Amino acid sequence: MRLRNKPWVKEYLEKNDKYLISWDKETKINLSDLFNNKKQPVHLEIGCGKGNFITNHALKESDINFIGMEKEETVVGVALKKTLAEFEQRNKEVTNLKYFNDFAEDLSDIFAPSSIDKIYLNFSDPWPKARHSKKRLTYRTFLDIYANIIKSHGILEFKTDNDGLFAFSLEEIAENKNWELIYQTTDLYSDIEALKNNIPTEYETKFHTAGKNINKLIIKKTF
């Protein structure tokens, strides 16, 4: 996600850096050093946007530690501001959510093997041109990377409004021995059971309101 530059963001992030994850690019992040409750599972959202999804998950699931990953500094600032406001409104302290303002093509450079319990991919860039297919976050090499950093039998959830990207993702998963498809739908909002625990992203709300179908799949690591 890209937003216009907001002059207040840099100073705001510096002031609230305890909610940010620093990475020296030389060593992997030690997840046990990030949160007060070190024994809680860790869920990672890759491309967290303005923070609605991960903020509401963190509010709802205090027994889980969350990481929101986003490479655009302005977006991280907007997301963190939303998080702090939502928690403050409920008189809660943010203890189970941190933001990571960085990115690496190979997440194995950042996270140790089998260190993440669950991964969320929400409305990722579809990279519609065929020559850019390797940049799609559900391309086979990315699926292999996720399988490396996620724990045994860990879960990955993926939502998108882009039907072409969804079809592509299903094909990639079908050919990848590391993952088993356990749920899929091309119309999430017609699945009443699935909606019970659904937390929408900003894009999701926008597209659904406009009448666009929302695709979702869930895969499980096979080992």
UniProtKB/Swiss-Prot annotation:
Catalytic activity entry: guanosine(46) in tRNA + S-adenosyl-L-methionine = N(7)-methylguanosine(46) in tRNA + S-adenosyl-L-homocysteine
Highest taxon, organism lineage: Bacteria
EC category: transferase
EC id: 2.1.1.33
Active-site residues, Swiss-Prot/TrEMBL: D125
Sorted UniProt keywords: Methyltransferase, S-adenosyl-L-methionine, Transferase, tRNA processing
Annotated pathway: tRNA modification; N(7)-methylguanine-tRNA biosynthesis
GO cellular component: tRNA methyltransferase complex
InterPro entries the UniProt entry points to: SAM-dependent_MTases_sf, tRNA_(Gua-N-7)_MeTrfase_Trmb, tRNA_methyltr_TrmB_bact
Sites where the protein binds S-adenosyl-L-methionine: E45, E70, D125
Molecular function terms from GO: tRNA (guanine(46)-N7)-methyltransferase activity
Entry keyword Glycoprotein: no
SUPFAM superfamilies from the UniProt entry: S-adenosyl-L-methionine-dependent methyltransferases
Binding site for substrate: K129, D161, T201, E202, Y203, E204
UniProt-listed PROSITE patterns: SAM_MT_TRMB (PS51625)
Family, similarity comment: Belongs to the class I-like SAM-binding methyltransferase superfamily. TrmB family.
Function: Catalyzes the formation of N(7)-methylguanine at position 46 (m7G46) in tRNA.
UniProt cross-references to PANTHER family, sorted A to Z: 3-DEOXY-D-MANNO-OCTULOSONIC-ACID TRANSFERASE/TRNA GUANINE-N 7 - -METHYLTRANSFERASE, PENTACOTRIPEPTIDE-REPEAT REGION OF PRORP DOMAIN-CONTAINING PROTEIN
Name the record gives this protein: tRNA (guanine-N(7)-)-methyltransferase
Species the sequence originates in: Mesoplasma florum (strain ATCC 33453 / NBRC 100688 / NCTC 11704 / L1)
